[in-house]
């Protein structure tokens, strides 16, 4: 039995999802009495300049670089077994070796496809269990390595895809993607309506615009939706202050039709009262929507994992996918007027969701490493005034 195991969680700041999953797992380990947990952005710490450039290109894939990202995502899939695999496998290796020597972790978890650890195991024979937590509803070969001990995945669909490319079924566990614990608590919606000054007698359309301008024509969309009877539009701008200020002028015209927020810490509260949501198809956002059974309208997925996520939710009947700006208003308005369709989508979301994914992942890892978890009950937090 490992007494007080040290856990190293490797992640990367490409979008917020991978880091959020890492933090959720860290909190869950601590909740179960495992205090020695380190979260590390291996690529950012190893090669900050290269990481900054690639993060910039990643964000540009939402606007001017979609074809470039398509080539990267699907191209790497085809040539992964060649030279690029060797280069990528050793990216961050120097920093990793230092981490392993100094921190001496008992367990390593990846929430980003970092294969430096399993590659180091292969080359040096070091003995350390490695776990990959996949953060999308699809799989890319870059996640796969023979020296990974176990994979935790979103659905049985992802498991089937992995088995098809040669991963033994017994190494794959369907747990769902870890989400913030607030999404799994019970909250009185009446308090939410009061807190955010929302109309209980109207349907609510939530638009998650994001900090990087990845959702286009937001102001024009809001103007169109403000004319729809019995609808209140709620826009979360994230840290995009320019967008927030631009939309606040619209809100002043009719605050019953439009509510604008910047960064919302407890965004699960808005999920709980919305009729449907326009967003990008990131794996974590979709998992959170599934947890609260929120029908989603997925805006112009980028080729790659976003597109794969969108197609999966569309096939399951849980999402409407928008591929052209001209479709957004008409398809959204039609959905909002179709209560039967909205209910069917909520049921589809319910069928996708697996409860308490972070807890199941942590319990499985601790059990495999013969570490006894100490359970501390989670208390339901009061609704925080944490939005701007």
Swiss-Prot record:
Reaction(s) catalysed by this chain's protein: a 1,2-diacyl-3-O-(beta-D-glucopyranosyl)-sn-glycerol + UDP-alpha-D-glucose = a 1,2-diacyl-3-O-(beta-D-Glc-(1->6)-beta-D-Glc)-sn-glycerol + UDP + H(+); a 1,2-diacyl-3-O-(beta-D-Glc-(1->6)-beta-D-Glc)-sn-glycerol + UDP-alpha-D-glucose = a 1,2-diacyl-3-O-(beta-D-Glc-(1->6)-beta-D-Glc-(1->6)-beta-D-Glc)-sn-glycerol + UDP + H(+); a 1,2-diacyl-sn-glycerol + UDP-alpha-D-glucose = a 1,2-diacyl-3-O-(beta-D-glucopyranosyl)-sn-glycerol + UDP + H(+)
Position of the signal peptide: none
Stored Gene3D superfamilies: Glycogen Phosphorylase B
Gene Ontology CC: one annotated term: plasma membrane
Subcellular location as annotated: Cell membrane
EC code: 2.4.1.315
Molecular function GO terms recorded: 1,2-diacylglycerol 3-glucosyltransferase activity
Cross-referenced CDD domains: GT28_Beta-DGS-like (cd17507)
InterPro entries cross-referenced by the UniProt entry: Diacylglyc_glucosyltr_N, Glyco_trans_28_C, Glycosyltransf_28_UgtP, Pro_diacylglycrl_glcsylTrfase
Pfam families: Glyco_tran_28_C (PF04101), MGDG_synth (PF06925)
Major subcellular site: membrane
Domain of life per record: Bacteria
Alphabetized UniProt keyword annotations: Carbohydrate metabolism, Cell membrane, Glycosyltransferase, Lipid biosynthesis, Lipid metabolism, Membrane, Transferase
Role noted for this protein: Processive glucosyltransferase involved in the biosynthesis of both the bilayer- and non-bilayer-forming membrane glucolipids. Is able to successively transfer up to three glucosyl residues to diacylglycerol (DAG), thereby catalyzing the formation of beta-monoglucosyl-DAG (3-O-(beta-D-glucopyranosyl)-1,2-diacyl-sn-glycerol), beta-diglucosyl-DAG (3-O-(beta-D-glucopyranosyl-beta-(1->6)-D-glucopyranosyl)-1,2-diacyl-sn-glycerol) and beta-triglucosyl-DAG (3-O-(beta-D-glucopyranosyl-beta-(1->6)-D-glucopyranosyl-beta-(1->6)-D-glucopyranosyl)-1,2-diacyl-sn-glycerol).
Similarity comment: family membership: Belongs to the glycosyltransferase 28 family. UgtP subfamily.
PANTHER family: MONOGALACTOSYLDIACYLGLYCEROL SYNTHASE (PTHR43025), MONOGALACTOSYLDIACYLGLYCEROL SYNTHASE 1, CHLOROPLASTIC (PTHR43025:SF3)
Protein name per UniProt: Processive diacylglycerol beta-glucosyltransferase
Taxonomy of the source species: Bacteria, Bacillati, Bacillota, Bacilli, Bacillales
Gene that encodes it: ugtP
């Amino acid at each position: 039995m490992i007494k007080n195991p040290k856990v190293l969680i490797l992640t990367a700041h490409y979008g917020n999802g991978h880091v959020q999953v890492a933090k959720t797992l860290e909190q869950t380990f601590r909740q179960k009495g495992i205090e020695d947990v380190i979260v590390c952005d291996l690529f950012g710490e190893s090669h900050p300049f290269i990481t900054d450039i690639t993060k910039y290109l990643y964000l540009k894939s939402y606007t001017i670089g979609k074809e470039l990202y398509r080539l990267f995502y699907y191209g790497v899939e085809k040539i992964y077994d060649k030279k690029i695999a060797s280069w990528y496998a050793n990216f961050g290796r120097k920093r990793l070796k230092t981490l392993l020597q100094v921190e001496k972790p008992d367990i390593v978890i990846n929430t980003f496809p970092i294969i430096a650890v399993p590659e180091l195991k292969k080359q040096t024979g070091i003995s350390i269990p490695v776990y990959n937590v996949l953060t999308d509803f699809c799989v890319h070969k870059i996640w796969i390595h023979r020296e990974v001990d176990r994979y935790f995945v979103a659905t049985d669909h992802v498991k089937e895809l992995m088995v098809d490319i040669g991963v033994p079924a017994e190494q794959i566990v369907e747990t769902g993607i870890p989400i913030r614990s607030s999404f799994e608590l019970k909250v009185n919606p009446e308090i939410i309506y009061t807190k955010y000054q929302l109309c209980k007698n109207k349907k609510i359309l939530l638009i998650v615009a994001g900090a990087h301008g990845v959702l286009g024509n937001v102001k024009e969309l809001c103007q169109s939706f403000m004319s729809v009877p019995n609808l209140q539009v709620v826009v979360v701008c994230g840290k995009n202050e320019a967008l927030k200020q631009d939309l606040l002028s619209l809100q002043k015209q009719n605050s019953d039709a439009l509510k604008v927020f910047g960064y919302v810490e407890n965004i699960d509260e808005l999920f709980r009262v919305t009729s449907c949501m326009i967003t990008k198809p990131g794996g974590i956002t979709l998992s959170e929507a599934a947890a609260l059974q929120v029908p989603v309208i997925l805006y112009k997925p980028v080729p790659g994992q976003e597109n794969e996520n969108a197609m999966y939710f569309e096939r399951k009947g849980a999402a409407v996918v928008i591929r052209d700006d001209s479709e957004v208003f008409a398809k959204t308005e039609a959905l909002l007027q179709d209560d039967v369709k909205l209910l069917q989508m909520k049921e589809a979301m319910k069928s996708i969701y697996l409860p308490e994914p972070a807890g199941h992942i942590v319990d499985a890892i601790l059990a495999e490493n013969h570490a006894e978890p100490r359970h501390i009950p989670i208390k339901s937090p009061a609704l925080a005034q944490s939005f701007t």
